[in-house]
Amino acid sequence: MSTWANLGLQDSASPLMEQLIFFHDHALLILVMITVLVGYLMFMLFFNSYVNRFLLHGQLIEMIWTILPAIILLFIAMPSLRLLYLLDEINEPSITLKSIGHQWYWSYEYSDFNNVEFDSYMIPTNELANDGFRLLDVDNRIVLPMNSQIRILVTAADVIHSWTVPALGVKVDGTPGRLNQTNFFINRPGLFYGQCSEICGANHSFMPIVIESVPVNYFIKWISNSVNS
């Protein structure tokens, strides 16, 4: 989860998020190099008192500053396209979770099991435990197994919402009348927090998401208790 004064990205909990962080660092390095080069050229031109009166055009330099940016853009575009295709790929999911956005809470359904569905509301500040997180904790968490391919289907019942968990690198828009899907793979146990990332009304900022990642045997016990209850 995001911590106080954290200016960087959250710690990744999925392979896709790790790849997104690598791409961020790759693109940032290229941007820093361009900024330093342009700043150096502007500094030299500003303090240079010499002018070449016989320089009317420079074909070589024009070719360089046309071809070089194209090559740089290729170095950014290729890993970006690879990640876009990876984000859309569905790899034989073990579990399917359906998320429905409402004003202003989430509903969840475990499509592979009967009668496993619940609503998830934010816990108000006056009911929050001493060790709870303000505006982030919910009354019913999503419980998912680690080291398993998980598919999530996202839609909305009223207005556009967006189901987002930064640590997993997941952001899916929930649109009324449409069913969007993506997949993710949680590689460690823990609690992962997210929020609705599409302005959806007065209580938009009170729609948190909490995923509890557990080992597979604990998940099976939880599902068994949920089906029997």
From Swiss-Prot:
Gene3D superfamilies reported in the protein's UniProt record: 1.10.287.90, Cupredoxins - blue copper proteins
Residues that hold Mg(2+) according to the record: E198
GO cellular component, one term: mitochondrial inner membrane
Binding-site list for Cu cation A1: H161, C196, C200, M207
Bilayer-spanning residue ranges: 27-48, 63-82
EC assignment: 7.1.1.9
Residues engaged in binding Cu cation A2: C196, E198, C200, H204
Needed cofactors: Cu cation
CC cofactor note: Binds a dinuclear copper A center per subunit.
Subcellular location field: Mitochondrion inner membrane
Keyword Oxidoreductase in annotation: no
Protein name (record): Cytochrome c oxidase subunit 2
Native source organism of the sequence: Drosophila algonquin (Fruit fly)
Organism taxonomic ancestry: Eukaryota, Metazoa, Ecdysozoa, Arthropoda, Hexapoda
Gene name as annotated: mt:CoII
